[in-house]
Amino acid sequence: MRKICVVTGSRAEYGILRGLMKAIKDDPELTLQVIATNQHLSKLQGETYKEIERDGFTIDYKVYMADDEAPDNANTTAKAISRGVSGFADAFDALQPDLLLILGDRYEMLAVASTALIYKIPIAHLHGGEISEGAFDDAIRHAITKMSHLHFTSTEAYRKRVIQLGEQSDRVFNVGALGVENVMKNEFMTKEEIEQSLSFQLTDKCFLCTYHPVTLSNMSSETQVLNLLMALDDYKDYHIIFTYSNSDTSSQIIIKRIHEYVDQNTGRCMFIPSLGQRRYFSALKYVKAVLGNSSSGIIEVPSFGIPTLDIGDRQKGRIVADSVIHCGYSTEEIKEGLKKAVAFGHKKIDNPYYKEGTCDAIMNVIKTYPLDNIVQKHFYDIQ
């Protein structure tokens, strides 16, 4: 049987991959292998690998990258990548996968792909060809594309960009975004169930906010998040759910400042490491807008007909739905954006990332595509 190894480094990413992982696990022609790494294994981030196990998956290997005791700087991130390369080498020796499946543009996936390249393990990559100009994730994503052998893009424009990068057109598949398909399949919680699970009231006026470091910005993450929090002071009648930043450099100062704000606004605000996909999608049915700079605000949130206030440059360059409102980093720009978001209301939105049958399309390729000599690639020149 073909051994498909899925690597996941965070709860958000795992939420996207979970349905596909189950399909692989349940297929009699495939064997699922799971590697958990980085944020999943961090105590600061809640040791979310336990959720993978609760869902009935076996974690075949754990690769420790995060150092919870280290300072929040570039040195720590770079060393995490080096630990990842070493750990993935051991994992690949132990598991001997036939195909590696990875998603996105996180630095832990750069460690995975670099190691797999040396081991001559074919890579199937999801969400290549996208643009996010404000973060070094953008360069990592394109680098992973060049180290990958099968490509599953979320739009036709991104499929063309992967081909533009020299990938052979018969190996690049526009399948849509798994996250959007997951919205359609989600078992939604009731408002009361969400409130009980969070010990937090979802009033008629609610925001959901996630703010990540903008790793290529000259403005400090602290200044950015303080500007956002000052803008939110104009909305004292709104309840706000904040979720944690990712593990990029400067994430800890963002988390610290939001914690302070939530402590000063007890009852009106709450802060949680992660809602988990089911509860996150369920909460989106009861909030007025999503704020911050997460890719989820661009990809999945439009399916709920509510606005996304996309702050700054982190997601700059992505294809967006009509419900996405862009604004700059200053408090005044965020205030103007919030006014537009509040006025937006609820509308039926065409989500550019939706395509029917995403999981089935990926499964068909990873089951049937010939893997013999696939690691030797030819640069595809556009005529």
Predicted regions and their residues:
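Nucleotide-activated sugar donor-binding and catalytic core shared by glycosyltransferases
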Residues: M1-Q383
